[in-house]
């Protein structure tokens, strides 16, 4: 499968929300149902308007996306149906061309993502007991050396 990376388009907001939903359901089983619903509401409002980088197939079908703010990767979500095919790696490598000192945060309980970032060469620089919304889901702070 050929993958290209491009900017997101407003009209594909629903597809990107669906990728977020399926990715979270596949990797974030530690979230409470109530908090998962709260996050989905926030994401549903935010994603269609966000300046995302999207990984698309040669049919221009989104299969993953990343949000980059300056040198910080705020989000990386891959459709679970295509995980393990290097799409996350491609998006991170794209981010590194734009922000060589890339940082990100990852839920400590998301062991698949923690392993992915460590394999990519990221180093842990710190830890927070709470997530960005102050909930008790610890975050690891990572940087690409």
From Swiss-Prot:
GO molecular function, one term: protein-lysine-acetyltransferase activity
InterPro entries, per database record: Acyl_CoA_acyltransferase, GNAT_dom
CDD domains, per database record: NAT_SF (cd04301)
EC number: 2.3.1.-
Domain N-acetyltransferase: 3-144
Reaction(s) catalysed by this chain's protein: L-lysyl-[protein] + acetyl-CoA = N(6)-acetyl-L-lysyl-[protein] + CoA + H(+)
Keyword Transferase: yes
Annotated keywords: Acyltransferase, Transferase
Superkingdom of origin: Bacteria
Pfam family of the protein (one): Acetyltransf_10
Gene3D superfamilies: 3.40.630.30
Family, similarity comment: Belongs to the acetyltransferase family.
Task of the protein: N-epsilon-lysine acetyltransferase that catalyzes acetylation of a large number of proteins.
Family matches, as NCBIfam families: PRK10514.1 (NF007807)
Name under which the protein is recorded: Peptidyl-lysine N-acetyltransferase YjaB
Native source organism of the sequence: Salmonella typhimurium (strain LT2 / SGSC1412 / ATCC 700720)
Lineage: Bacteria, Pseudomonadati, Pseudomonadota, Gammaproteobacteria, Enterobacterales
Gene name of this polypeptide: yjaB
């Amino acid at each position: 499968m050929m993958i290209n990376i491009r900017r997101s388009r407003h009209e594909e907001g629903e597809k990107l929300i669906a990728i977020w939903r399926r990715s979270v359901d596949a990797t974030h089983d530690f979230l409470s149902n109530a908090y998962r619903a709260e996050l989905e509401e926030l994401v549903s409002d935010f994603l269609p308007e966000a300046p995302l980088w999207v990984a698309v197939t040669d049919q221009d079908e989104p299969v993953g996306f990343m949000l980059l703010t300056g040198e910080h990767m705020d989000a990386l979500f891959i459709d679970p149906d295509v995980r393990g095919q290097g799409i996350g790696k491609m998006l991170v490598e794209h981010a590194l061309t734009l922000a060589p000192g890339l940082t990100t945060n990852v839920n400590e309980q998301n062991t698949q993502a923690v392993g992915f970032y460590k394999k990519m060469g990221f180093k842990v620089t710190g830890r927070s007991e709470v997530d960005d919304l102050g909930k008790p889901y610890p975050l690891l702070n990572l940087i690409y050396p």
